[in-house]
Amino acid sequence: MMKIYYKIAIIVLPAIIVSMICMNPFLSRYAAAEEKNFNFVAVGDLDCNINSMQTVNNILDKKPQIFLALGDMYYDCNPDEFMKVFSLLHGILYMTMGNHDSWSKFAGLYHLPNDKPYYSFDKGNVHFLSISTESDLRPNSTQYDFINTDLDIASQNRSISWIIVLAHRPFISSETEHITEKEDFKTYPPLFARYGVDVVIQAHVHNYQRTFPILLDNFSNPIIVTKNNTINEGTGVLYITTGGGGHDLYEFKSKSPYVQTQYAEYGIINVNSTENALTIEAYTNKDFESPKDTFTILKGYNTTKPTPMLKYVYINTSKGNGTIPTPKGLIEIPFENGTVRIPVKYNYSLPH
């Protein structure tokens, strides 16, 4: 009988590394799950203090299948104190890199699927794209090409109902500390609108903010599509800042005209995703039971709400001159002199 010998290697790692490897969601059962009804929680800027523990309890109260950690979770925490906070979130953690997360420390603590600080993944019928606002975001950068290609593919995938972008630094926010950001950020809101992103979830600013559904073809002139708290998918992009994880809160200097709700309190957002609706609820640490802010996005046209809605469609014409017939032949759009991109705004109450 042939004998087979095995060599066993024992590697001693710091407790924090071992614990974070055990928490890696890309190796857990959650990453492969395909159910369309699930909930996830998001917050950034956690830190290690009594406010952080209240935030973790708030998260656990929602029983999420995914926890989206939006950067700056560690700060200068003692590793043991950090693990007291994070060990309770075993197996559901997806990280987005923040400005206090050096890549060397970040890459050592959190395994990412492509060994880059940006990545994407699907959960059920939701596509998540995590952007690194600490890496090169200039047009034609490696990350820009990844984002552009990823959103293009996701927008054409019929099995994807919702597209959600995750970032640490905010693309759009009311005036407060940290609000002066990179010039390259202006490239992205038009890109998000073009590919039908539903929600952009961001942090860095230590408070809560939610915009109206907006569209930006020109960054300096955001268009508020509607002021309703229930909208149809494709009506506009929602920008949510949830940076009240536990670090010092930031008070507001003003309220931007495209921000609908804002407050400086610790808390999280909980998102319930189904095949036909995305419901976003903001919970403060003072009240785990009653959401302080709620917003719902409906999939497709909701016949029970006949209020006309607006949607933007980008049409790329071929070279040359001619006309573009719209569905049902309602109108024709003339074009000339090569390829142009035309924003078309139409009424949902009409056939299309």
Go through the PLM ranges and name each one.
Residues 26-81, 173-174:
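N-terminal active-site segment of His-dependent metallophosphoesterases
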Residues 34, 249-323:
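A short C-terminal boundary segment appended to hydrolase-like catalytic domains
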Residues 1-33, 342, 350-352:
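Secretory targeting signatures
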Residues 322-324, 329-334, 339-343:
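Short linear proline/tyrosine/threonine-rich motifs used for host-factor recruitment
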Residues 45, 71-72, 98-99, 168, ...:
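Active-site glycine-centered loops adjacent to acidic/histidine catalytic or metal-binding residues
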Residues 78-163, 177-188, 193, 199, ...:
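Extended active-site neighborhood of metal-dependent phosphoesterases/phosphodiesterases
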Residues 40, 67, 128, 163-164:
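Hydrophobic beta-strand anchors of alpha/beta hydrolase catalytic cores
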